[in-house]
Amino acid sequence: MLYSLPTEIKLYIFKFLNYEDLCSMKQTNLHFRDFINNFEGELAREEFYEIDIDVDLMRGGFPKLIKPESKNVDFPLSEELEKKFKNGFTQPIPLCLSEQFAHFSYIFLTKVYNDEACYFQLQLPSIIKSKNDIKIVYFYLNKLFNCSFEYGNFKDFIFNPELIQLLFGNAKQFYIQKCKIYIDNDIGKIFGFILNNLVGEKLRIDFLLEDDILKIYKNTLFTILLNGDKFQKIKLMFDNDTKKSNNYKSVLYEQIIEHISTSKDCSKMVPVIILKFFNPKKFKLSKKAEKVEIKKLNGVKYTNYQISNIQNPKVKFSFCNKESSGDYGSEVEIKIFKEFEKI
């Protein structure tokens, strides 16, 4: 009966199946296998607990090694890719970005079965040169794009957005619910990865950069904060405590205030934004702050206030500035979230 149904009806039905059900259906016959493969980006995804990239072979104990070879990858390149990369890349290109370990990295995946963690180590070519390398990387990256991950942790490595662009264009994205990214180099490429190839619920970015570098990419960072359709919450951690970095933090704060108060459309802004600064200079409250309330609790100063939009006064954002001091210096955390109009 399913065979004769229109494609859109079959797709609607298959969307009710979980990943295990889809795997079972694929094994019944070639028709269902090809149909599910064709629409796998719209159907249930294989779920993993975590993904990260590391050089530590013993990470997670003794993970199961997955080291594919091109002869075992039953996946022909499309005619377009076959023609484009028949002789491999003109210049070798790394799978991941890393200042120190670009030639040596492993993808670690964690999956939970019956409340027990299982670890996998996916060893792909670190430097892609040949057509066979391209075939392996294309196949497995495409599989990862069609999975979902609860956590992602990218400290020393990140997938190379230039490689993704060459193989897939900008259409492919990793689905990671809670993702943490550290930035101490290649900021432009990492921002490109976040904008084009990452989607999830929460994103945390730890910056270990000087102010002069951050300023160059301030507009790109602000564009990330306007991706409310991709992220529900973004936390920016500024670990550099130099005077120059403090100046940039003030500029970013003022840029957010200006957008909230004057933009004709605030709907695209990420609903919750957290800025955390270490050892900042004395924080200056915006003159546009309304309904200011200040209180101290256990040595921590809390300043709550609102910023209204002049184009539409019903659009309001609430702020909470949390200022504290300790043995390791002072810190300021600013939480910004959109107030939704009560019906």
Predicted regions and their residues:
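Conserved phosphate-interacting/catalytic interface
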Residues: 200-343
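Seven-transmembrane-like multi-pass membrane architecture, highlighting hydrophobic TM helices
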Residues: 20, 25-31, 101, 133, ...
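Universal eukaryotic N-terminal targeting presequences
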Residues: 1-2, 343
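Residue-level detector of alpha-helical recognition elements and their boundaries
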Residues: 28-29, 47, 167, 236, ...
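Skp1-binding F-box subdomain of Cullin-RING ligase substrate receptors
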Residues: 3-91, 95-96, 150-153, 172-183, ...
